[in-house]
Amino acid sequence: MEFGVLLLLTLTVGFLLFLVSQSQPKTHGHLPPGPRPLPFLGNLLQMNRRGFLNSFMQLQEKYGDVFTVHLGPRPVVILCGTDTIREALVDQAEAFSGRGTVAVLHPVVQGYGVIFATGERWKTLRRFSLVTMKEFGMGKRSVDERIKEEAQCLVEELKKYKGAPLNPTFLFQSIAANTICSIVFGERFDYKDHQFLHLLDLVYKTSVLMGSLSSQVFELYSGFLKYFPGAHKQIFKNLQEMLNYIGHIVEKHRATLDPSAPRDFIDTYLLRMEKEKSNHHTEFNHQNLVISVLSLFFAGTETTSTTLRCTFLIMLKYPHVAEKVQKEIDQVIGSHRLPTPDDRTKMPYTDAVIHEIQRFADLTPIGLPHRVTKDTVFRGYLLPKNTEVYPILSSALHDPRYFEQPDTFNPEHFLDANGALKKSEAFLPFSTGKRICLGEGIARNELFIFFTAILQNFTLASPVAPEDIDLTPINIGVGKIPSPYQINFLSR
């Protein structure tokens, strides 16, 4: 549905809903300043067509690092800048640990699952997930071994192209998805498996739909737009199809479960369900399982694969950086074994390049919404319990107080005078605090192993000259993706 039609519909019903809103109890508290909202419309007129991020960054210039916007009738507090975000999510971690609502996902997730739960449900599921994914199955293959296996499969697949140009999107989706599938489902899929290809297609299409203008408008007025056509309808359909597939996988696991030898995340969860079946208040139920698996699969596939697409586009733009990384690979790893996470500490330049790619690419500029769990005083303002909070991670990744050239790709941002890796408090691609990305450790190891394995085995080439490569991303709502490109992987 086009923006103009949505706006007209909003204005048409706005008066009636405004009358309803006047009968509702007012929010107590003293929220940060912000643009004056219109009845029901909120700050719709301050939101430009380029999306929430551009609108918020413009408002930051006027109102500072902490301000309030009204997304439709509901107030949302916006946090900008490294210090502001860390002060909230780290220094007052418990108060800001609630999960806000993502309107286009809520009809499916409904507060279930490790990513979208809040309160004790979230704490219970997060503890379980962290332990299960870190110590996965006593005596079983480690997560890193699974990543290395996928890296080897990728290298063999790329060799089949014999240096011919290709769009790497599908292969990068496949290796990221297979890593999480191996952990959660206990198996990896062939790159030509039809069901696997269909799942990847659903993930990609759903991500694009979530970034559409229609979805952003839905975020403001979901209460009545849910009754009309729009991207949210297809998102719901896609997610339900993925849930049905996951439910089928869960039933297969249940039928073949061996309590003495859990194979994966699902097996481990089913064993915990059985252990707590007499506890009527347990959070280990079917709904939390399937939504957790859906969340892990979706997040683990799209974010890592998009980062890899950005990574190699940037390497094509700056071939001297790729050459320097290859030199470090040759010195530390050589050519006769796959990289391991342990190699990273001996490869500061490569590590700095990966850090800078994540910072510069800035793929998730607006973190998932938070919600304060109690009345909270923050920088002199009173945020009532359940106030939603948006941390603008992009404002940290491009914070001029921490990065000398925030809008320029420069690995030196993460190297000290001695060439050692330099940490930065502004490096927040995974967010921070209690809600930091559950799969941060896995994602970091994936990026390192996949990146170094490819450059260990291949020299990169492009049909386009480096000076003509455009790194300007495509903005999809609250996220970014690189423009499609072709790349040649030439065997070294």
Curated annotation (Swiss-Prot):
GO terms for molecular function: arachidonate epoxygenase activity; heme binding; iron ion binding; oxidoreductase activity, acting on paired donors, with incorporation or reduction of molecular oxygen, reduced flavin or flavoprotein as one donor, and incorporation of one atom of oxygen. Keywords: Endoplasmic reticulum, Heme, Iron, Membrane, Metal-binding, Microsome, Monooxygenase, Oxidoreductase, Phosphoprotein. GO terms for cellular component: cytoplasm; endoplasmic reticulum membrane; intracellular membrane-bounded organelle. The modification Phosphoserine is found at S129. It is a peripheral membrane protein. Disulfide bonds: none annotated. It comes from the Eukaryota. It holds the Pfam family p450. Its main location: endoplasmic reticulum. Its EC number is 1.14.14.1. One of its GO terms (biological process) is xenobiotic metabolic process. It catalyses: an organic molecule + reduced [NADPH--hemoprotein reductase] + O2 = an alcohol + oxidized [NADPH--hemoprotein reductase] + H2O + H(+). Preputial gland, but not in liver. Its cofactor is heme. It is found in: Endoplasmic reticulum membrane; Microsome membrane. Cytochromes P450 are a group of heme-thiolate monooxygenases. In liver microsomes, this enzyme is involved in an NADPH-dependent electron transport pathway. This isozyme seems responsible for metabolism of 2,2',4,4',5,5'-hexachlorobiphenyl. PANTHER family: CYTOCHROME P450 508A4-RELATED, CYTOCHROME P450-RELATED. Belongs to the cytochrome P450 family. This is Cytochrome P450 2B12. It comes from Rattus norvegicus. The gene is Cyp2b12.
